[in-house]
UniProtKB/Swiss-Prot annotation:
General function of this protein: Catalyzes the conversion of D-ribulose 5-phosphate to formate and 3,4-dihydroxy-2-butanone 4-phosphate. Catalyzes the conversion of GTP to 2,5-diamino-6-ribosylamino-4(3H)-pyrimidinone 5'-phosphate (DARP), formate and pyrophosphate.
Annotated residues for binding of Zn(2+): C254, C265, C267
Superkingdom to which the source organism belongs: Bacteria
Higher taxonomy: Bacteria, Bacillati, Bacillota, Bacilli, Bacillales
The keyword Manganese belongs to this UniProt entry's keyword annotation: yes
Binding residue positions for GTP: R249, I250, H251, S252, A253, Q270, E291, G292, R293, T313, S348, K353
Keyword Lyase found: yes
Protein name per the record: Riboflavin biosynthesis protein RibBA
Organism of provenance: Staphylococcus haemolyticus (strain JCSC1435)
Co-factor: note: Binds 2 divalent metal cations per subunit. Magnesium or manganese. Binds 1 zinc ion per subunit.
Catalytic activity reported: D-ribulose 5-phosphate = (2S)-2-hydroxy-3-oxobutyl phosphate + formate + H(+); GTP + 4 H2O = 2,5-diamino-6-hydroxy-4-(5-phosphoribosylamino)-pyrimidine + formate + 2 phosphate + 3 H(+)
């Protein structure tokens, strides 16, 4: 499909136009019409009802929901994607509440500073949805996309969305969405592109502590960061003052290898090798909580069970329903930005780490391989990393 740049979509929204926002194939795999409440024109909701044909909802921030006492529609949300519906509403000035103009009045009242909870009748014909506070970086839904787009256009954190359906009542997908885009002259973006746009703008790590850390491999400074998005704790082990071009090891936490010295992998040996290198040459190790290439400790152990039954490290992840590698290097890039590191000599054998850092604006100027000895227990694992995952070992 043909997609537009986020900046072009933002300009269209500020002109009062609707845009199409498409989510992931593994999620709802649908396109929604999205407009920003503050900028939408008088025909927006009528267009959504006539051409979109889906349910018209009003994504809002948590603060707006609290302001108007908009409580969840149900006590126990069993929606497959956790869509956070509140009780439906009509503005007190509307008639039946269902006309396009009544729903427009209700939506606009949600961003009126003078509106009060008493101005809304419940239930009604407009369905507010509460967005997660960290937007698409926390949940990749149309709700969060609409509120994020509103904020990016400097508008009140509220929008209007509607699923796009075909004339026969089926959901529009793929080529059908592209035809809809061209028929109505609309911009179309993906939530994935919005996630990447937000990550580029995001500064989501905060330094919480810094201490001296003597180790078996030298004396380091240890920095403790926290992600404001996930509340995860990230440790950085550093030697010397940060440089514009820095020696960097991005190490994914491996409890079994780093702590218990498991011979199933080479993680612990790589960490020790990196510490020795950084102690001698300066630089930093960013220790990310990405156990099992992002699937978590228990799932990693389940993958080990499958490996004992004949799978390799890639097919085991796939059999559990995961991609072969779920890791993202957004947080690592944020930490490097914190230290004003613009390019790195990356201590790694993994090309995906080069790509992951480059995606977030960190240049990989050079690479230092980390070569560790194989053993009888990790030989097949190492071979799979080389052949199937492209590791340079």
């Amino acid at each position: 499909m043909e997609f537009d740049e986020i900046k072009d979509a933002l300009n269209a929204l500020k002109r009062g136009e609707s845009i199409i926002v498409v989510d992931d194939e593994d999620r709802e795999n649908e396109g929604d019409l999205v407009a920003i409440t503050q900028w939408m024109n008088d025909n927006t909701i009528n267009f959504m009802a006539k051409e979109g044909r889906g349910l018209i909802c009003a994504p809002i921030s948590k603060d707006l929901a609290l302001k108007f006492n908009l409580m969840p529609m149900v006590e126990h949300n069993t929606d497959g994607f956790g869509t956070n519906f509140t009780v439906s509403i009509d503005h007190a000035t509307t008639s039946t509440g269902i006309s396009a103009f009544d729903r427009m009045a209700t939506a606009r009242a949600l961003i009126n500073p003078e509106s009060t909870p008493e101005d809304f009748h419940k239930p009604g014909h407009l369905f507010p949805l509460i967005a997660k506070e960290n937007g698409v970086l926390e949940r990749t839904g149309h709700t969060e996309a609409a509120v994020d787009l509103a904020k990016l256009t400097k508008a009140a954190p509220a929008g209007v969305i509607c699923e796009i359906m075909n004339e026969d009542g089926t959901m529009a997908k793929g080529e059908q969405l592209e035809a809809f885009k061209h028929q109505h002259g609309l911009k179309m973006i993906t939530i994935e592109s919005l996630v990447n746009y937000q990550k580029d703008k995001d500064t989501s790590v905060e330094l919480k502590a810094k201490v001296n850390m003597p180790t078996d491999h030298g004396a380091f400074e240890m920095y403790g960061f926290e992600s404001s998005l996930t509340k995860e704790e990230i440790v950085v082990l550093a030697k010397g003052e940060p440089r514009v071009t820095e020696n960097v090891r991005i190490h994914s936490a491996c409890l079994t290898g780093d702590i218990f010295h498991s011979q199933r992998c080479d993680c612990g040996a790589q960490l020790e090798s990196a510490m020795k290198y950084i102690n001698e040459h300066g630089g930093m190790i960013i220790y990310l909580p990405q156990e099992g290439r992002g699937i978590g400790l228990i799932n990693k152990l389940r993958a080990y069970e499958l490996i004992e039954q004949g799978h390799d490290t890639v097919t085991a992840n796939l059999a559990l329903g995961f991609d072969e590698d779920l890791r993202d290097y957004h947080i690592a890039a944020q930490i490097l930005n914190y230290f004003n590191v613009q390019q790195v000599n990356l201590l790694s054998n993994n090309p995906k780490k080069f790509e992951g850092l480059s995606e977030y604006g960190i240049k990989v100027a050079d690479r230092t391989p980390i070569i560790v000895a194989e053993n009888e227990h990790n030989h097949d694992y190492m071979n799979t990393k080389k052949i199937k995952m492209g590791h340079l070992i």
